[in-house]
């Protein structure tokens, strides 16, 4: 009986479980800016991530270990080293970088084929919406062929890491899905 109440309490208000979330995407998409926007609520000066940044965030009564992995071509093959025990992937796309949308789509779908990520929820940030010429979230969704993702919870959110727009809404959706499906 106690286990039933404990389980219900955890589902409603969170648990002490630590969740691993990966922030992935091509170089220059805004991954590190999003990470630190989530952690400290402001924009910090960043440089290209060679390797990774990892921060622990408390959000909605959950402890999130958020791994921001570099997106350069030479680093992407190493993403798979971080897939184990991942609850969710945040994939960040530079909505102004139309020339690399097909590369972003290829990398996204390759990654999602990995067995270790089969149960991971996916949040896509169509980032840099504050920039002229940015594709809308629905246009980015089409470019990434997100409609092909049949057996996975996913969402795409228009965002501007610099202005802080869309970040909280996206993370709220992600945490709700994780609580519903994995906790």
UniProtKB/Swiss-Prot annotation:
SUPFAM superfamilies: P-loop containing nucleoside triphosphate hydrolases (SSF52540)
SMART domains per UniProt: ARF, RAB, SAR
Gene Ontology terms, MF aspect: GTP binding; GTPase activity
Chief subcellular location: Golgi
Domain of life: Eukaryota
Similarity section: Belongs to the small GTPase superfamily. Arf family.
Note: Present with 5190 molecules/cell in log phase SD medium.
PANTHER family registered for this protein in UniProt: ADP RIBOSYLATION FACTOR-RELATED
Assembly and binders: Homodimer. Interacts with IMH1 (via GRIP domain); the interaction is dependent on GTP. Interacts with MON2.
Protein name per Swiss-Prot or TrEMBL: ADP-ribosylation factor-like protein 1
Species this protein is from: Saccharomyces cerevisiae (strain ATCC 204508 / S288c)
Lineage: Eukaryota, Fungi, Dikarya, Ascomycota, Saccharomycotina
